[in-house]
Amino acid sequence: NASAFEAEAVPDEFLPVNYEAEENIYGGYLMWNQALSDKLSMLAGVRVEATDISYIGNSIQFLEDEILIEPAIGTDNYVNVLPGLHFKYNFTDNSMLRAAWTNTLARPNYYDLVPYRNLVEGDEEIFQGNPDLDPTTSMNFDLMFEQYFSSVGVLSAGAFYKSVNDFIYVSQTEDPNTGYD
């Protein structure tokens, strides 16, 4: 029975998550596959991506007697060059060693990029997105040995190393000038 409930707008719950986002990614890939010998092959490639993003969020200020709402706009564009190099060495028809050097990226979640700002004066807290976040990038080295068995399947062992940059995380700081968290 809907009449048993009283409707109440709760803008602090829905306004920060209401946003418009536009993201365009333009990419291209070049690849070269080469047999270096009867046992060794190489695959080299590079992917280039250009990203354009724009967001419109809400800047919200909860004052004692009113709520101030203004649009917040954020844009960014960047280019990533992601080379890769793969080698495969066949010891036999059933055993091989693979080695790879790759570069990858992980873009931030849309909501993390939205330029929203939620200022709650009573709690002395500010929550906000960051449209200037860079994607997380990593340079990866992988080594894998594979042995195939006709009756059992495959036995493989591998090792890898990743160097991760621009890792995205949530932080909380206190501004001594304002007292806000």
Please tell me what each predicted stretch does.
Residues G28, A44-A50, A99-N103, L155-Y161:
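Transmembrane beta-barrel strands of outer-membrane/channel proteins
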Residues N1-T92, N118:
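Signature of Gram-negative outer-membrane beta-barrel scaffolds
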